[in-house]
From Swiss-Prot:
InterPro entries: Kelch-typ_b-propeller, NANM, NanM_proteobact
Sample GO molecular function, one term: racemase and epimerase activity, acting on carbohydrates and derivatives
Keyword Signal attributed: yes
Domain of life per record: Bacteria
Organism, scientific name: Haemophilus influenzae (strain PittEE)
Subunit structure: Homodimer.
Protein known as: N-acetylneuraminate epimerase
Enzyme Commission designation: 5.1.3.24
UniProt keyword annotations, A-Z: Carbohydrate metabolism, Isomerase, Kelch repeat, Periplasm, Repeat, Signal
């Protein structure tokens, strides 16, 4: 018996369907939030973050396939690393991990995984910028990385916190000084970086004509790059969106309209949103923010999210003819998972939901220009 629920949402001017009859994917063995992943052929790789030092694979073309654990990642447990696939191999960069003193620190190392023999190799290179909050995607023979926190500033904050020991007053003083700054004073990465595995070289692909971001949704499809929102300083997101295009003269950028606000709500931008393409339509969903933070920032409060609660979201947006609109909602709030475009669907793998609870679920969303389907 086919169990489908269809709702015509007049406020959204879209039909969306929850389908229990389409292909379903197995849950992850463990909840993975703040991790990373990539697609190689028909196989998706997901790991790290709350998954520890583990990576798992799933053959998407096999309806009966289950997740399989691959060789343990040799770089140790870490959150918010960047990953991408080039020439059939998986590359993992950076992240945030504890050192021997117990300090959370940005790391800028790089590793390669070869599926043919299930082995990892540490690469003789280091990223030229901090890679926490960075977003990565591959194009041709390169990995492109956008945004990220400043290594020295971020590491210094955690070093100072550990040095404060049990002195809560000192910790409060450190936090107040850290959050009470303008966005530009955090020195988020404002260059588009690339890494070319064949030459083991990093390249500055040009300065982005917008503020540095952390946790932005970043997607490359063909020669087009799309950047949606992200943090512009700790606790403060932006609703701005941008589009780039690879040309003979480098990446040419233009601004897109801001992401619209859901009905009856403010739009405080999103960090940790998930994105991809379905039937040629760009989709972005989920993410988290602090409702009211943009208002407080405009009122002159640099610690923009002070006193506010973090919120996770479920709206699904699409970009059509240069305009954004909301076409439906997920059955749950989600953020900081891994998303990948596959077979005209966008897979939403893991992530976290309200309160930061790690998810094991694998959802698929698709959109044909009229109807959003959620599996």
């Amino acid at each position: 018996m086919k169990l489908t629920k269809t709702a015509l949402c007049t406020a959204l001017f879209a039909t969306f369907t929850f389908s229990a009859n389409a292909q379903t994917y197995p849950d992850l063995p463990v909840g993975i939030k703040g991790g990373t992943g990539a697609l190689i052929g028909d196989t998706v790789y997901v790991g790290l973050g709350s998954g520890g030092d583990k990576f798992y694979t799933l053959d998407l073309k096999d309806p009966s396939a289950q997740w399989k654990e691959i060789a343990t990642f040799p770089g140790g447990e870490r959150n918010q690393p960047v990953a991408a696939a080039v020439d059939g191999k998986l590359y993992v960069f950076g992240g945030l991990q504890k050192n021997e003193k117990g300090e959370l620190q940005l790391v800028n190392d790089a590793y390669r995984y070869n599926p043919s023999d299930n082995t990892w190799m540490k690469l003789p290179t280091r990223s030229p910028r901090g890679l926490v909050g960075s977003s990565g995607a591959s194009h041709g023979d390169k990995v492109y990385i956008l945004g990220g926190s400043n290594l020295s500033i971020f590491n210094g904050f955690f070093q100072d916190n550990v040095a404060a020991g049990e002195d809560q007053a000192k910790k409060d003083e450190i936090a107040a000084a850290y959050f009470d700054q303008r966005p530009e004073d955090y020195f988020f990465t404002t260059e588009l970086l690339s890494y070319e595995p064949s030459t083991n070289k990093w390249r500055n692909e040009g300065r982005i004509p917008f503020s540095g971001r952390a946790g932005a949704a970043f997607t490359i499809q063909g020669n087009d790059l799309v950047v949606v929102n992200g943090e512009i300083k700790p606790g403060l997101r932006t609703a701005e969106t941008h589009q780039g295009k690879f040309t003979a003269k480098g990446v040419q950028w233009k601004n897109l309209p801001d992401l619209p606000a859901p009905k009856g709500k403010s739009q405080d931008g999103l960090a940790g949103a998930l994105s991809g393409y379905s039937n040629g339509h760009y989709l972005v969903t989920g993410g988290a923010n602090f409702p009211g933070s943009i208002k407080q920032y405009k009122e002159g409060k640099l610690h923009a999210h002070k006193g506010l609660s973090k919120a996770w979201h479920n709206e699904v947006y699409t970009l059509n003819n240069g305009k954004w609109r909301i076409v439906g909602e997920l059955p749950m709030n989600i953020g900081y998972g891994f998303s990948v475009s596959y077979n005209n669907k966008v897979l939403l793998i893991g992530g976290e939901t309200d309160g930061g609870k790690a998810l094991t679920s694998v959802k698929a969303i698709s959109y044909d220009g009229k109807k959003l389907t959620i599996e």
